[in-house]
């Protein structure tokens, strides 16, 4: 499983620089360890650091175990969503890469991509009993589905798409998958808009993935809890990939009295990285530093 997990870390130099001046010894909590790319870079340049790596995706944990094997007992991998975890000791840094990995997109069985047919799943945690995308579409009323597509995907044709999906359902019957869903969504667009640079189904697939995994809800939990995990002077670094996440991170960092924002504007990929790794084009890194340990969470 791990051998098929390919995940090139985005903004590697920016992450290293953001966490460069932290203490020589401490614990790094990688809230989305993925394939272990960011963590391996940080453990290399901080030989006194230990790692707690979280991921609810079993394929990601297997890949991380292989990537980080050379660090031995410095590494602890935990099967957990970061919203359900609390470290038992202060940490010097918290890192979260909120993007879907290349592996998750490239494996049709995961149901994240419309570029190859697969089941309408979209769950990050395939070992759990959470609701699939197909079940979610079937369960929601048309208006609720339209609201979901609009708010989570910023899809301007959300009403039209929701009406078509409910008309053509049920989707949780094992007969149709991601290709059929993408075809139905694209059919709601005028012919000239169906084959642009951004696929017509992109926003709807994003919205369904966010809803299935409660991505904004668990991010809210992380942003509320993580400052309490940090040592004074420790840093939290969050990489987001769409405006909903970035806006949430920006506003919470700014409003949280426990934190000092390190950079007013997000750090983004260089032209060279964006060309070499298209996934990095939409990546934004925001960093904040922990102030006094006595302050309570922002409400």
Curated annotation (Swiss-Prot):
What is any one GO biological process for this UniProt entry?
Answer: rRNA base methylation
- The main enzyme category here is transferase
Superkingdom, natural source? Bacteria
Chain positions recorded as S-adenosyl-L-methionine binding sites: 36-38, 55, 82, 97, 104
Q: Which GO terms describe its cellular component?
A: cytoplasm
Gene3D superfamilies (UniProt xref):
Putative methyltransferase TM0872, insert domain, Vaccinia Virus protein VP39
| Keywords from the named record | Cytoplasm, Methyltransferase, rRNA processing, S-adenosyl-L-methionine, Transferase
Compartments, as annotated in UniProt? Cytoplasm
Database matches in InterPro entries: RsmH (IPR002903), SAM-dep_MeTrfase_MraW_recog (IPR023397), SAM-dependent_MTases_sf (IPR029063)
Q: Which reaction does it catalyse?
A: cytidine(1402) in 16S rRNA + S-adenosyl-L-methionine = N(4)-methylcytidine(1402) in 16S rRNA + S-adenosyl-L-homocysteine + H(+)
Q: Pfam families, from UniProt?
A: Methyltransf_5
The Swiss-Prot or TrEMBL record annotates one GO molecular function as: rRNA (cytosine-N4-)-methyltransferase activity
Give the Enzyme Commission number: 2.1.1.199
The record, for NCBIfam families, names: 16S rRNA (cytosine(1402)-N(4))-methyltransferase RsmH
What HAMAP family does this protein map onto? 16SrRNA_methyltr_H
The similarity comment for this entry is:
Belongs to the methyltransferase superfamily. RsmH family.
The role this protein plays is: Specifically methylates the N4 position of cytidine in position 1402 (C1402) of 16S rRNA.
The protein's name? Ribosomal RNA small subunit methyltransferase H
Q: Which organism is it from?
A: Synechococcus sp. (strain RCC307)
